[in-house]
């Protein structure tokens, strides 16, 4: 019995702290079906705020707190940005945007399993993913292991930093939320 106990103690001494954190982040992601959160998004010098719901895999609905009535919706295949006040309507295949990877929980889990933590401080854990010539920084809260935000370069080559707060997990959702809005002229 002492031999087994010694082996267990030895194993935990050689297990890097990073491995434990990575396992916790991965387990948290695996348990997460959806999240709702407030966000602050900085694109170049412009700051926008709003609320989003992510429903894995690859669905998102965001409503911006602005006077324009801006929304962003992905049904898992396509991404639409619609601005109600101006009638502007932008349609993109999701696979051509960096959000395609951010919204893919299984992709994130696979990458985190392969990566080392790229940065860490008392509050945040960061993983840097490079995929298809895109650099994506994914942030997690060190204490809760919740997704905390991401940094990407958007399809217009703008640096986009999104930080999230007030997270609610695994809520009952109406899937109609993720239907693409119609274009209105």
Please give the residue ranges for each predicted region.
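Sec-dependent N-terminal signal peptides
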Residues: 4-13
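Short, solvent-exposed coil/turn segments at beta-strand boundaries
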Residues: 31, 53-59, 74-78, 121-122, ...
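An acidic-aromatic
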Residues: 52-101, 160
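Boundary at the C-terminal end of the N-terminal hydrophobic targeting segment
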Residues: 16-19
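A short, Trp-centered hydrophobic/proline-enriched beta-strand micro-motif
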Residues: 27-47
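Short hydrophobic/aromatic-rich beta-strand segments that constitute the beta-sheet cores
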Residues: 37-39, 60-64, 79-82, 127, ...
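Gly/Pro-enriched, hydrophobic low-complexity segments
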Residues: 110-185
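Flexible, surface-exposed loop/linker segments and immediately adjacent secondary-structure boundaries
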Residues: 85-124, 129
């Amino acid at each position: 019995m002492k031999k087994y106990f010694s082996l267990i103690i030895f194993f935990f001494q050689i297990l890097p702290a990073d491995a434990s954190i990575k396992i916790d982040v991965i387990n948290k992601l695996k348990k997460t079906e959806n999240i709702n959160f407030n966000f602050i998004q900085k694109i170049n010098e412009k700051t926008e705020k709003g609320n989003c719901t992510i429903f894995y895999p690859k669905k998102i609905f965001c409503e911006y707190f602005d006077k324009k009535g801006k929304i962003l919706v992905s049904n898992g295949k396509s991404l639409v940005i619609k601005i109600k006040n101006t009638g502007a309507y932008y349609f993109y295949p999701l696979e051509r945007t960096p959000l395609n990877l951010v919204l893919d929980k299984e992709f994130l889990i696979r990458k985190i399993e392969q990566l080392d933590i790229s940065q860490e401080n008392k509050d945040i854990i960061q993983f840097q993913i490079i995929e298809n010539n895109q650099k994506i920084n994914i942030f997690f809260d060190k204490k809760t292991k919740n997704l905390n935000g991401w940094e990407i370069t958007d399809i217009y080559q703008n640096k986009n930093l999104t930080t999230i707060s007030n997270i609610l997990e695994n809520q009952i959702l109406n899937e109609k939320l993720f239907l693409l809005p119609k274009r209105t002229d």
